[in-house]
């Protein structure tokens, strides 16, 4: 493994010596708080983040839910804008009476709670509050700024689908970029593919990586794979600085497209992603819940259709610890060899194919679920196709 971090002025130094633009800290995860691009899903003002999964806008563990507003979104020149309705409903990163609860203006009128068996870690990085606890039902739970990023025994549907939907749709993936993924679940799934030669992981928050090394050693061990380069820095800037046509696939395990995180879902970022992909290359990014955010999903699709000249598709799956129990994905390809996302050509679940692994069996993904992920409820289909 090669680890690349940032220099004294805060900019990231890559292997080729390029120093990316300051400001948008892109990151690494799908959920975290506010780091615009990948690693956090909440609103700290750092573009991207570090966590591996999910939604969450700042929310907290507060017991009160006063006066939250649900902002509407508009699209202007490819941007996703909201009013000030995404404020946190409580910013207390603590456990109340043995329960962790997550409130957010992103899902007003509802909350999600888990019984806490043991607090394993609580601290503050340069970017966010980080907490890890043992839950009664889902094993270890990682939260960032009060938002659940991943659960050990409930997050595997998200991870398996964000990796195998795109990589199962192209032959012989070799070079892959992960924006986010500092815990290591996404990397774990990616290493099932023996054809892969190079994996770059961009994580903004070194504390998240440290938590992985201490609490998920079986995941952190994969950072030592000689094919892996771990970059502690800005994911959006990394993509902009990437060599044109270099990657076969890019996985964007990003934060929500609201507040500072919205840059990861707008045209300039998608244009940088498309440039970094080879002809017929693929990208998969998280794309919210059809039960809460259809207006956001429509804007993301509109942006992607303007940039990606291959195919643009929306898929979804179930994740028990995410709001409404579901999460969506955008899957797009660049112009070149045709990519049919709905019919996997490289199905990792088939022992008879070239894709074999010594890892534990898949818990969620299979070829049938791959195909079914693109079948949408009538209300969602009509809105997306309109």
UniProtKB/Swiss-Prot annotation:
Annotated EC: 2.1.1.53
Molecular function GO labels: putrescine N-methyltransferase activity; spermidine synthase activity
Region (Disordered): 1-87
KO phenotype (gene knockout): Plants suppressed for PMT1, PMT2, PMT3 and PMT4 exhibit strongly reduced nicotine levels but accumulate polyamines in roots, and have an impaired leaf maturation phenotype at harvest.
Induction of its expression: Accumulates upon the removal of flower heads and young leaves. Triggered by jasmonic acid (MeJA).
Catalytic site: 253
Pfam family, one: Spermine_synth
Family from the record: Belongs to the class I-like SAM-binding methyltransferase superfamily. Putrescine methyltransferase family.
NCBIfam families named in the record: PRK00811.1, speE
Name listed for the protein in its UniProt record: Putrescine N-methyltransferase 4
Organism of provenance: Nicotiana tabacum (Common tobacco)
Lineage: Eukaryota, Viridiplantae, Streptophyta, Embryophyta, Tracheophyta
